[in-house]
């Protein structure tokens, strides 16, 4: 992508489309580097991408697609140093961000963009889901993406995750049952990882509805699939599935089996508080709390 854009820019340095896509490609590379914990490379990518996005904006003020790049920069340049203070020295020499402005820009790109509307909607959904913890807004965007691309497994799974976050367990069951069925049918994109996630959340739906015995087979299946899929150590799904299995055993009065499960969890990487919960339930058995929905 960058090479293609460079070739176009050699012919016309003011090619707005080439500038936009080059800046976007570098920006996406920076985001990938950040998620791989290569913070220096991520900061450097942001430093290189911003002038390109600003240049495209100055050449075409009406182009809402450009707001994808400026919006992402403004949001993450403001939020990341606060979430990860050790990154601050790496970004001393790049412009400060503005979280609220970033959200506003991404919203405009999502609603008015010609080429970048889907990407802007996706990143805005992730921002609301992971950083802002505004699950209702994330759910609305996930539903929008799934409605437009009903066979896209990523958007389908995010819809389910957002429903989990707003405690709509009836809808959670419906969404993840559909995902599991598509995975069983071998539908394109619905790989084993989709089936694993579906099993976990179907188990959670049973747990939340006070049906631990029905939940157990789902957690067993999730754990079994993790043993096939987790080539580089236990995943979050493995840790949480084993924790839930222990909790079900406690409900069933099988304390020795429950203790064995919690000890397994403590041997795995902590995920979403799994270690703290396992430690707590080793000291005192888990007791079922049924919440009305």
Identify the residue ranges that each predicted region occupies.
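Primarily a tetratricopeptide repeat
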Residues: 3, 44, 51, 97, ...
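Structural signature of alpha-solenoid helical repeat scaffolds
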Residues: 10, 58, 94, 112, ...
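TPR alpha-solenoid repeat register
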Residues: 18, 66, 119-120, 155, ...
């Amino acid at each position: 992508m960058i090479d293609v854009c460079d070739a176009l820019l050699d012919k016309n340095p003011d090619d707005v489309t080439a500038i936009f896509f080059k800046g976007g490609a570098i920006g996406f590379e920076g985001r990938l580097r950040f998620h791989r914990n290569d913070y220096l490379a991520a900061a450097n990518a942001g430093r290189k991408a911003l002038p390109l996005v600003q240049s495209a904006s100055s050449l075409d003020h009406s182009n809402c697609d450009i707001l994808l790049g400026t919006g992402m920069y403004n949001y993450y340049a403001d939020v990341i140093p606060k979430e990860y203070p050790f990154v601050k020295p790496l970004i001393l020499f790049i412009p400060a961000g503005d979280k609220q402005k970033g959200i506003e820009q991404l919203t405009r790109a999502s609603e008015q963009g010609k080429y970048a509307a889907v990407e802007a909607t996706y990143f805005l959904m992730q921002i609301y889901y992971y950083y802002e913890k505004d699950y209702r807004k994330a759910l609305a965007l996930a539903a929008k993406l799934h409605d437009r691309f009903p066979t896209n497994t990523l958007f389908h799974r995010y819809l389910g995750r957002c429903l989990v976050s707003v405690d709509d367990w009836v809808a959670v069951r419906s969404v993840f049952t559909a995902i599991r069925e598509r995975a069983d049918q071998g539908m394109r994109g619905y790989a084993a990882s989709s089936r694993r996630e579906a099993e976990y959340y179907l188990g959670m739906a049973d747990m939340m509805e006070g049906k631990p015995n029905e939940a157990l087979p789902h957690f067993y299946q999730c754990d079994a699939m993790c043993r096939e899929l987790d080539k580089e150590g236990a995943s979050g799904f493995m840790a949480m599935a084993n924790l839930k299995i222990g909790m079900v055993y406690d409900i069933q009065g099988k304390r020795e089996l429950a203790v064995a499960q919690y000890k397994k969890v403590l041997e795995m990487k902590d995920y979403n508080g799994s270690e703290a919960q396992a430690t707590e339930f080793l000291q005192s058995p888990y007791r079922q709390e049924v919440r009305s929905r």
